[in-house]
Regions:
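Charge-dense, extended regions
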Residues: 167-231
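Helix-turn-helix DNA-binding elements, focusing on the entry/boundary residues of the two helices
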Residues: 6, 17, 28, 43-46
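DNA major-groove recognition helix of helix-turn-helix/homeodomain DNA-binding modules
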Residues: 42-59
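Recognition helix of helix-turn-helix/homeodomain-like DNA-binding domains
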Residues: 24-40, 62-67
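Short basic helix-loop element that most often maps to the first helix and adjoining turn
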Residues: 4-23
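Helix-turn-helix/homeodomain-like alpha-helical modules used for DNA recognition
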Residues: 68-131
């Protein structure tokens, strides 16, 4: 989030600098410096602005260019993180602090194995947070050789968007697919199900969708079968 986004959010809420500063617990002079880019926006401030100004979690900070995002093999509560971001399948788990959807998506795609219900929620992130930082996400997916998993995720999201005649979202998702296509990997992978047996892999090769085959993934997931595609 930068000063321009902060100003736009204030105006969208029909607030003066004085009103916004009071709501966020800072002075009007300090608020003015934030909008002009003279002062950095701390994560704590952005999280408070997220609540007060009703902002999208896509404004939350992402790991720096230098730091990148690790493969994060440790156990993660992705169901809770999806629920915090509004995913209907885990709506009852909205108790965690929100994280940037792009970071949640990348970290989830880096997992060797995910609960099937969590995996089904990943295209929902791409669909519902289409304004996320795709440049950051695509770049980091390539760093970790996860562009095929990301490409398949976006393909499913695009299927859902087109099925709902949501041309604006579909256009943005197709642009992401175009950015990923040149770096598509030839090696075979799973959609976060590396523990799949040889028998299961053989079955998947015969029954996967054209999109899964295009992205060289062994999975039977299809956009039309996702619960949120039917609503």
């Amino acid at each position: 989030m930068d000063g321009n986004q902060l100003r736009d959010a204030r105006l969208q809420n029909d607030l003066t600098q004085v009103d916004a500063a009071l709501a966020l617990g800072v002075t009007q002079a300090y608020w003015s410096m934030l909008e002009k880019g003279y002062r950095p926006l701390s994560e704590r401030f952005v999280r408070k602005a997220l609540r007060v100004l009703h902002l999208s979690p896509t404004v939350l900070p992402l790991p720096s260019e230098e730091k990148g995002t690790p493969a994060s093999p440790q156990k993660r509560d992705f169901s809770g993180e999806l629920g915090a971001l509004g995913y209907p399948g885990f709506a009852y788990l909205r108790v965690k602090a929100k994280r940037n959807p792009a970071e949640v998506l990348l970290d989830a795609l880096n997992q060797p194995d995910l609960d099937a219900r969590v995996a089904e929620g990943l295209p929902w992130l791409a669909l519902n947070y289409v304004a996320m930082d795709w440049t950051w996400l695509v770049r980091n997916a390539k760093v970790h050789d996860r562009q095929n998993r990301l490409g398949f995720t976006v393909s499913l999201a695009n299927e859902v968007a087109e099925g709902k005649s949501d041309s604006d979202r579909a256009r943005k998702l197709r642009q992401c697919l175009e950015d990923l296509e040149p770096s598509r990997l030839a090696r075979e992978d799973t959609f976060c199900h590396d523990s799949m047996t040889k028998v299961e892999k053989a079955w998947m090769r015969e029954h996967r969708s054209p999109a899964a085959a295009h992205w060289n993934l062994l999975t039977d997931m299809k956009g039309e079968q996702l619960a949120y595609a039917l609503k």
